[in-house]
Design a protein with these regions (language model features):
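Auxiliary Fe-S-binding modules of radical SAM enzymes
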Residues: 141-286
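Canonical Radical SAM [4Fe-4S] cluster-binding loop centered on the CxxxCxxC motif
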Residues: 1-13
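Short Fe-S-cluster ligation motifs
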Residues: 13-39, 198
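Well-ordered alpha-helical segments embedded in enzymatic catalytic cores
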Residues: 13, 17-20, 113, 117, ...
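Alpha-helix termini
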Residues: 22-28, 122-124, 241
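Conserved AdoMet/S-adenosylmethionine-binding subsite of the radical SAM
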Residues: 43-185
Length: 286
């Protein structure tokens, strides 16, 4: 675990990839957002601000950044994020104790400093802040915890607050969704924070532009997060290169089987659904 900002990949290569994907995707559909996420925390990228600026020069498309918000106490991070149109920080707790239990932050991170960073960013930022709250059963779904979280959100004044739950296999077995009653309670208590409930399964397509091999495309997505088996099948079925470059006898099931037999992906059942994840990931429900 690191808390130091640096360039994990050459920023020029990242920018070229962004430019290429924008050109390909915009040729056949409208792009809603360019979103910076990352295999980890995007604000750890030292060149994030530069990448946002350069992306804005490429196309007039809104830019969003999905972040855990832990580094917003730093002025350089706030300056970088101020160039985005939407910033989506996480805030799963209203108290330091619950924050530590859920997020298990870097040892140097102080909860009050994290919240203060969010508040300072709100005061200076002209874009929209969409806070994401992950509800975990037995940790932050009680009335007391939700009211503590509400008081923090009142200071941050987000444009939207998205409530979600662990819908993919979590890293720890205790990270399970709350009961429906607890979700309803959260919707009610946090209602003044412009709540949007997204506790159902995600929808939408995964972009596979730039890949000439379907198995490489699936691996690239699964490395970021587990995929439901239906998502894997739909993604392979919708690949733009399927009709052009793949043999007539190409089989989606054979692709999945080859990846599994090679040890690159593995199957995991979670909440009565089959997920696929890379063999590198350690999940608490195995």
């Amino acid at each position: 675990m690191t808390n130091q900002r640096k360039d994990f990949f050459p920023p020029e290569e990242l920018l070229n990839e962004i430019k290429r994907v924008i050109e390909v995707e915009s040729s056949h559909r409208e792009i809603d957002f360019v979103t910076f996420v990352g295999e980890g925390e995007p604000t750890l990228c030292k060149s994030l601000g530069w990448l946002i600026r350069k992306t804005k020069e490429i196309a007039d498309i809104p830019i969003a950044v999905d972040t855990n918000g832990s580094l917003l106490y730093r002025e350089d991070v706030r300056n970088d994020l101020s160039q985005a149109d939407i910033v989506m920080p996480s805030l799963d707790a209203g108290t330091a104790e619950t924050y530590r239990k859920i997020n298990r932050p870097h040892r140097v991170l102080d909860f009050e400093a994290v919240v203060e960073g969010l508040e300072r960013f709100r005061r200076d930022y002209n874009g929209e802040i969409w806070v994401e709250v992950m509800l975990v059963k037995g940790l932050n779904d009680s009335e007391e915890e939700l009211k503590a979280l509400k008081s923090r959100l009142e200071e941050i004044q987000p444009n939207r607050t998205y409530i979600n739950v662990p819908i993919r296999p979590p890293a720890e077995p205790w990270a399970v969704p709350p009961d429906k009653e607890a979700i309803t309670l959260a919707d009610a208590i946090l209602s003044d924070a412009n709540v949007v409930d997204i506790t159902e399964e995600e929808t939408g397509e995964f972009s596979t532009e730039g890949f000439t091999n379907p198995e490489d495309a699936i691996l690239a997505i699964i490395r970021r997060h587990p995929m439901r088996e239906g998502q894997v099948i739909d993604t392979l079925r919708n690949l733009s290169f399927k009709k052009k470059a793949l043999p007539k006898k190409y089989s989606i099931r054979d692709s999945i089987k080859r990846l599994e037999e090679s040890g690159k992906i593995k199957k995991l059942k979670y909440r009565e659904k089959v997920f696929w994840l890379t063999d590198e990931e350690k999940r608490g429900h195995e």
